[in-house]
From Swiss-Prot:
This is DNA mismatch repair protein Msh3. Belongs to the DNA mismatch repair MutS family. MSH3 subfamily. Residues 413-424 have a biased composition (Gly residues). The keyword Protein transport does not apply. One of its GO terms (cellular component) is MutSalpha complex. Residues 36-48, 100-125 have a biased composition (Polar residues). The gene is msh3. Residues 270-280 have a biased composition (Basic residues). Keywords: ATP-binding, DNA damage, DNA repair, DNA-binding, Nucleotide-binding. Residues 1-391, 405-451, 592-612 are annotated as: Disordered.
Length: 1428
């Protein structure tokens, strides 16, 4: 075989190309010169010598059964002259342009040699054709190149998707395209002809192409994946691909390899990713004829120039021999196309602009390719689910924001350069990414091409980027859609179907179900935004951007505290004010950082390092968007944060604003402008809030740290009020409100208010509620009976302890209100009873007068009853929605005004000069007085003299401006309000647009006249189909032949065909545009009309407050009318004060038993200042001790609320607080045991109680050993008696505590719950448990036994256990008796001598014997069991 000599010109060109390649690329693969020469020049001459020639032959020859031996014979004949072969190739390259073939280079997973190399070696022809000298020269050159460009190798696998460059670079130069060097790392593509360029343009948004660098070689060839029916040698390659959702597929592809020069591509390549990382496209990106899903992973190298990139686009096709396997792959492709689209965008955002990476493959290990996807080893099962699929949107956006910020900082600092490929594109670049490249890509942008986002997806991405923490509901025609991560939330919470469409997971809801599903998302704790279409089809058609998508904007945002658009009358949610609260915790002043840090550390461990460190000053401001209330307070709290718990229990917030959470939380300092270093929240405060939010599912929102700076927050408030004052949109006088805020609120509260303002500004007009001065109310616990959190829970004021439901609680019994605002106020009355005697008596007088009126059916009471029986909407919420303008509908406005008008008329009727309607109660008379219009806003005067009151005047004004019948039909926010106004003279634009619509309608009539004449059909009329949105249709029978050709057929039936004439369509276009304009103008006029209401908001709000007060008083009157309820008496004198309840009953238990045959056993209890002030209550288990405690406390609460109480007589002092220590619970979250919480609550009681406090302690000390429990209980009660001197009910099972009565006979009394014990023989006492009958009556004296074994028997414990317990109980009693006797024996003689001495002294000098000597005498006398 003669050796082949390379042409000198080609050698020179080869050297220049290699020099360029080495200097331009960053890393170049090592090329084996032997294999390169073998594959490029020493191929046997055959039909496969030239790819173009083979393709031409194959197109003509379709005989599939041609003899393979003939083929080999032909190949051997053409091997005589290789130089002729090279010349032949160059000649054919010039003569014709072959159809470009799509390259595909499968690699063998186990060997570095290609199949064709092995085949050539077997024939014995390849090695003999190589010149040894030439090989040595090539090896030396390649070694030098290898030293300068080290490479990494990875195995190449065939996969579905391929790494692509985002930009389409220019075409290669002609010289470069003619000659390229073959390398086992390269993929070759021919220059694309015009037909394939057109095809690429058509599928630009769906196809992904790999752009690679090609070294020059003598002849440009490509490897083409051919059908199995062709005559070329085929090989099968199996690959594994991974979809974006983590599912894997195993693919097998039959590839046709035409000649050995291209077969070298099968060798293991050195992988190099061009440009920045790009995400793979889904299966739909490839040729529709090739429905299999494999494309080979090609070896890629850096381009020498941008022009080199264009002509090498990897666009491979594949076929499968097995038809069944092919069908299966089609199904797989469809399924993965749906799944892969889900997170294409997000992974692309995450992966793009990152530095290039290369990963080595270890045998059997997963392969990480450039896009970040993992190709699993062969044999991995198909379709493995990825539970984290589709949840990367928020993470991606946060990453984008951080990179954009870094880019801005770099530019600001003068940084430039390429940025390492890590910079994020701006919005302009995103718009460029979705544009199609120019034909052929020769003039394509240098920017990278991204995924094909639809216009709607682009809008979603932009809005989501600005609101990453918001679940977006995007309006799309008659649906609201969710995308991506938001769709997953909707799928989980709403339980609706989700599917993959384009680049996102999608799901949708119909428009009419918006608020139903919105409410579910909000109540689940999500922040939800409504993205609405701000354009209509009619206006879009005439706009300059009619080719663009509909404009959409985020118009409304809701959370659990700001959701007031719900029209569902849910008592559970409507009774809640839905407070949004912000807290601020002040650090101790005059403390250095070390001291503060030490105290914080002690707090973490629950250690009270000092009196000052255990307390904390906390401020808060709470806003109710629903009711308009703004409450504020500052209080000092103890280590238990009991005051904070009490505040949370009272206001029941729906959302809490907290400081930013960082890894150094509670250690980060802020200059708060108050002069101290602030540590945000202490650990104890944070734990308290965290425990509360978890147990109640309250939403928390972290705020910006700068908002906790005093100067910053004050500046925000000043700007807000000054801007509102300058706008002159209302007469609320924002300057006065600002003065009020500065003078009334302290600095900490101003910080909280600034935080709330900043948060409310994110919503629609909610910040305007802060402009009403009358909304601000101080939360003064000292003005009311203090009921801490533990008391509200233990006494079951709001919910019962068994299942946390309202039934069985005090509010369940007493709340008989008829209005929503009244219900909210009544809950506040129960949690904050009065503590001022004058106010209590004033309320009692009003309740008593209403009770008498109910019993006598007096006319005013009958009118009030009829009023509250009628439907009254939530006036408080509706007023707030009217004040916010955009939230109110005409129907809601009409209902609110008509309801207020009806109530005002009733008030005027009751308040006239008719004596039968006069009330004696001062409180009732103040409620029914209306503000006189002549007083002109003087809030201190509410006298009605006979003229028209201001409220009635304003209601008439608002109702006179709207059409009541039309307003009833306008029940949605975006409804057409064009016919709402009575007088159009005030709205000139609306009148002009209506006139234009009338002209169009006249034109329709003229068009119809002309059509009648033209068709000779005088009876022809327009037909309208409102259900389909079709109007002005012309109906003709199908048999009618004279229909003009210009008419457009809309629809038809067997009897009728409907058309639109061109003249009609032209007028319809004008009509639609005019209607949309009218709708916009009507909405603007409606907002302007509601703006007039803001002037009178305070007037209407005060009146609704009167209605709520009347509703609450009427509710108390209904309860007080129950049988057996009496008016309690309050005494001023301290010596006569205390608790004297005769035959009192538990109000809730009695109400529950009233439905059955049972009845509650009344009890009399007396705690007097001059007599027994503390009661020790003992007795058997289940004897009624705890019920007696709750009964007493509930009667006190009901009395101070102003209600009658269940008793035959009741005399009380005015108490300032009720503290309780009942039940047993632990707090795992804060690391507190049951006994620790028990002692914490006891400590809090002892620190805060006064002489006018009622303290209830139930079985204190039971959480520890008997000795410790007795000691703690004894010491606590003794401290209460000696030091605190408060009213106390102390329940215990410890007999030792009964001895306190001996020490303090005038202050302590022993009582027990009565019972009857069945007498038994003395022989059976130790073996049989006696039967006990509970009497549930309070009896004087201490109980001797608790009868715990009787309860064990009732509970169903096994008899063996009970018998053993009885035996052990008897043994313990005997042991205690023996020890007592021994002790008594030792001291008996000494005590006897002392008693004799006392008696002797007493007899000798009775006048000097004091009471203590007598008590000591009695105690010692009893201890030795002597009888006088």
């Amino acid at each position: 075989m003669p050796r082949l000599k390379l042409p000198k010109s080609f050698k020179d060109e080869l050297e220049s190309e290699k020099t360029t390649t080495t200097s331009s690329r960053k890393k170049a693969p090592v090329v084996d010169p032997k294999q390169t020469l073998m594959s490029s020049f020493f191929t046997p001459v055959s039909k496969s010598t030239d790819t173009k020639e083979i393709n031409n032959k194959e197109d003509k020859d379709e005989d599939k059964d041609k003899d393979k031996d003939n083929k080999k014979t032909k190949k051997s004949k053409d091997t005589s002259d290789n130089e002729d072969m090279v010349d032949d190739n160059n000649k054919q390259q010039k003569e014709k342009k072959a159809t470009p073939n799509k390259s595909n280079s499968p690699q063998s997973p186990q060997t570095s040699k290609s199949p064709l190399t092995r085949r050539s070696s077997a024939n014995g022809n390849s090695d003999s054709k190589i010149d040894n000298k030439e090989k040595e020269k090539e090896k030396e050159k390649e070694k030098e190149k290898d030293k300068s460009t080290p490479t990494k190798t990875t195995s190449s696998r065939v996969k579905k998707d391929t790494e692509v460059s985002k930009s389409i670079p220019p075409k290669l130069s002609k010289q470069t395209k003619k000659k390229q060097i073959s390398s086992d790392n390269d993929i070759y593509d021919d220059e694309k002809d015009s037909e394939e360029e057109d095809l690429e343009d058509d599928h630009d948004d769906e196809e992904e192409k790999v752009v690679v660098k090609k070294p020059s070689k003598p002849t440009s060839k490509s490897i083409t994946a051919k059908p199995a029916s062709t005559k070329a040698t085929t090989t099968t390659t199996t690959t594994t691909t991974t979809t974006s959702t983590g599912r894997t597929r195993v693919n097998r592809v039959n590839l046709d390899i035409s000649f050995s020069s291209e077969s070298e591509e099968d060798e293991k390549p050195k992988k190099k990713i061009i440009g920045k990382k790009r995400k793979k496209k889904d299966d739909s990106d490839f040729d529709s004829e090739s429905e299999s899903d494999t494309i080979s992973e090609a070896s890629e190298v850096e381009p020498e120039s941008e022009e080199d990139l264009d002509s090498f686009k990897f666009n491979s096709k594949k076929k499968n021999n097995n038809k069944n396997n092919n069908n299966k792959k089609k199904n797989d492709e469809y399924e993965d196309e749906e799944e892969d689209e889900d997170d294409e965008l997000f992974k692309d955002i995450e992966m793009k602009d990152k530095p290039e990476e290369e990963e080595k493959e270890e045998e059997g290990d997963p392969i990480v390719i450039g896009s970040g996807r993992v190709v699993l080893p062969k044999g991995t099962p198909d379709f493995q689910p990825d539970p984290k699929a589709g949840k990367k949107l928020l993470k991606a956006h946060l990453e984008i924001q951080s990179k954009e910020e870094a880019k801005r900082l770099q530019q600001a600092n003068g940084g430039g350069g390429d940025g390492g490929g890590g910079q994020i594109k701006g919005s302009d670049d995103e718009d460029e990414e979705v544009k199609k490249p120019t034909k052929g890509g020769s003039k394509a942008s240098a920017k990278k091409k991204g995924p094909a986002y639809t216009p709607l997806e682009q809008q979603y991405i932009a809005i989501k980027k600005e609101n990453p923490d918001t679940v977006l509901m995007v309006e799309c025609g008659y649906k609201y859609k969710f995308f991506g991560e938001d769709a997953e939330v909707a799928n989980k919470v709403l339980n609706i179907y989700s599917y993959v469409a384009k680049n996102f997971l999608n799901c949708s809801i119909p428009t009419q179900r918006l608020f139903f599903h919105l409410r579910r998302l909000v109540m689940a704790g999500y922040k939800v935004g409504i993205v609405e279409q701000t354009e209509t089809a009619a206006l879009k058609a005439i706009s300059s951007s009619k080719s663009q998508p509909f404009e959409r904007k985020l118009t409304r945002v809701y959370t659990s505290s700001t959701f007031i658009d719900d029209d569902i009358d849910d008592q559970l949610t409507s009774s809640s004010p839905q407070f949004l609260v912000s807290f601020y915790e002040s650090t101790p002043k005059n403390k250095n950082d070390d001291v503060i840090k030490k105290q914080r550390d002690n707090e973490e461990e629950g250690i009270d390092s000092s009196n000052e460190s255990s307390t904390s000053t906390i401020s808060f401001v709470a806003v109710s968007v629903k009711t308009g209330e703004i409450i504020y307070d500052t209080f000092k709290d103890n280590v238990m944060r009991s005051q904070l718990e009490t505040i949370l229990t009272h206001i029941k917030p729906s959302e809490i604003l907290i400081p930013p959470t960082t890894t150094t939380v509670n250690k980060q300092k802020v200059n708060n402008g108050i002069g101290t270093n602030h540590y945000y929240f202490s650990n104890l405060t944070s734990k308290c809030l965290k425990t509360y939010t978890k147990s109640t599912n309250v939403r928390t929102q972290a705020m910006d740290s700068q908002l906790y700076d005093y100067e910053y927050s004050l500046g925000k408030l000043i700007d807000f009020y000054e801007d509102e004052s300058n706008n002159n949109n209302n007469n609320n006088n924002c300057e006065d409100v600002l003065k009020f805020v500065k003078s009334t609120l302290n600095k900490e509260q101003i910080i909280c208010l600034g935080i709330l303002l900043s948060y409310l500004n994110e919503f629609i007009h909610f910040g305007s509620i802060l402009k009403v001065e009358s909304n601000f109310k101080a939360f003064r616990v000292s003005n009311h009976l203090v009921l801490p959190h533990s008391t509200i829970v233990n006494l079951e004021l709001l919910v019962n302890e068994s299942d946390n439901k309202e039934k069985g609680s005090l509010i369940w019994l007493m709340n008989r209100t008829s209005t929503f605002s009244g219900s909210r106020m009544f809950i506040n009355w129960i949690c904050k009873p009065l503590n001022q005697l004058e106010l209590i008596k004033e309320r009692q007088d009003a309740v008593e007068e209403l009770v008498n009126g109910i019993k006598t059916n007096s006319p005013p009471i009958v009118s009030i009853i009829s009023l509250f029986k009628s439907h009254i909407p939530d006036l408080q919420r509706n007023l707030s929605r009217i004040y916010y303008k955009v939230q109110c509908t005409p129907k809601e406005f009409l209902n609110t005004m008509t309801s207020l008008q009806r109530i005002v008329e009733l008030f005027k009727e009751i308040n006239n000069n008719n004596s039968s309607y006069k009330f004696n109660s001062t409180l009732l008379n103040s409620i029914f007085k209306l503000q006189n219009d002549n007083k002109d806003g003087d809030s201190d005067s509410f006298d009605y003299i006979g003229g028209e009151d201001k409220l009635s005047k304003r209601i008439k004004y608002f109702l006179s401006n709207i059409n009541k019948e039309t307003a009833k039909e306008y029940g949605t926010v975006g409804c057409d309000k064009s016919n709402l106004w009575v007088d159009l003279e005030k709205y000139e634009k609306i009148r002009e647009t209506k006139e234009k619509i009338e002209q169009v309608e006249k034109e329709f009539k003229n068009v119809l006249k002309n059509i009648r004449k033209e068709l000779s059909k005088p009876s022809l009329e327009y037909h309208h189909m409102p259900g389909l949105g079709l109007e002005y249709l012309l109906e003709l029978p199908p048999s009618f032949k004279a229909v003009p050709k210009s008419w457009i057929k809309v629809n038809s039936t067997q009897k009728m065909a409907r058309y639109h004439a061109p003249e009609v369509l032209e007028q319809l276009k004008i009509l639609s545009q005019s209607r949309e304009t009218l709708k916009i103008q009507s909405q603007e006029s409606w907002i302007s009309f509601l703006g007039e209401f803001s002037v009178d908001y305070s007037l209407f709000s005060n009146f609704v407050n009167k209605i709520s007060n009347l509703d609450c008083l009427f509710s108390l009157a209904k309860v007080s009318s129950l049988e057996g309820y009496i008016r309690p008496q309050f005494v001023k004198e301290k010596k006569d004060g205390g608790i004297q309840i005769e035959n009192g009953r538990h109000p809730v238990v009695e109400a529950i038993l009233s439905g059955s045959d049972g009845s509650y056993v009344p009890n009399t209890i007396e705690l007097r200042e001059s007599a027994c002030k503390s009661m020790i209550i003992t007795g058997p288990n289940m004897g009624g001790k705890s019920s007696l405690l709750r009964q007493t406390a509930l009667i006190v609460i009901m009395a101070q609320v102003g209600c009658f109480v269940p008793a035959t007589s009741c005399s009380l002092s005015v108490f300032d607080a009720i503290y309780t220590r009942m039940g047993a619970r632990d707090s795992i979250g804060t690391g507190k045991s049951t006994f620790f919480i028990e002692l914490e609550e006891t400590s809090d009681i002892l620190k805060n109680s006064t002489q006018n406090t009622l303290v209830i302690l139930d079985e204190l000390g039971r959480g520890t050993s008997t000795n410790d429990g007795v000691a703690i209980a004894y010491s606590t009660l003794k401290y209460i008696v000696e030091v605190m001197k408060c009213y106390c009910l102390f329940v215990t099972h410890y007999p030792l505590l009964a001895q306190l009565e001996l020490q303090y006979p005038t202050q302590v009394g022993n009582f027990h719950m009565g019972y009857l014990e069945e007498k038994q023989d003395q022989q059976l006492q130790k073996s049989v448990i006696p039967k006990v009958i509970f009497l549930y009556k309070l009896v004087k004296g201490a109980a001797q036994n608790s009868y715990g074994l009787n309860i064990a028997r009732l509970a169903g414990l096994p008899m063996e256990v009970i018998a053993d317990a009885l035996k052990k109980s008897n043994e313990m009693k005997e042991s205690i008796t023996r020890r007592a006797n021994l002790s008594d024996g030792k001291d008996q003689q000494q005590i006897e001598n002392e008693i004799k001495s006392i008696i002797k002294n007493w007899n000798s000098n009775r006048t000097t014997l004091n009471s203590n000597d007598l008590l000591q005498f009695i105690e010692k006398f009893k201890s030795i069991q002597l009888k006088l």
